[in-house]
Amino acid sequence: STAAASSPVPAGAHQVTYTVTTTSDLTANIYYVSADPPDQASANKPQFMPMARTQVGPSAPWTLQTTLNDPTQWGFVSASGGLRVNPEFRCEIAVDGKVVVSQQGGSGVQCALRPW
């Protein structure tokens, strides 16, 4: 393999699973990278980073699977919402079935495989 030793995921098509959970029921705004953008400047465009406005709660996690060629570069999910109550957001990114990052936050949270 020619993948860099520091890269946790070799290049090629990888199954990426984003999961967002909360401790209370609410409508969340969830942004996620759905496809590899050609460059960082394009990453925020809706065709690469759509927004899902959806109900999330303790018994209703939000999960989305997509395929990314370079999840180390582009794996990203963020969620926010719940201004009246602290929903204790939690996000997780799994690559090829293995959780590679998870974070917890109050009224918002972000998971990425590199600094954004």
What positions do the PLM features span?
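Short beta-strand-to-coil "C-cap" segments at the C-terminal boundary of structured domains/repeats
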Residues: 34, 113-116
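Short, well-ordered strand-loop elements centered on a beta-strand within folded domains, enriched
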Residues: 28-31, 101-102
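Noncatalytic modules at the cell exterior or secretory-pathway interfaces
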Residues: 10-23, 71-79
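Extracytosolic low-complexity repeat regions of secreted or lipid-anchored proteins
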Residues: 61-114
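N-terminal low-complexity, Pro/Thr-rich disordered segments
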Residues: 1-13, 38-49
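Short beta-strand/loop motifs in extracellular/secreted proteins, especially
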Residues: 26-29, 87-89
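Mature extracytoplasmic domains of secretory-pathway proteins
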Residues: 32-83
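Aromatic side chains
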Residues: 18, 31-32
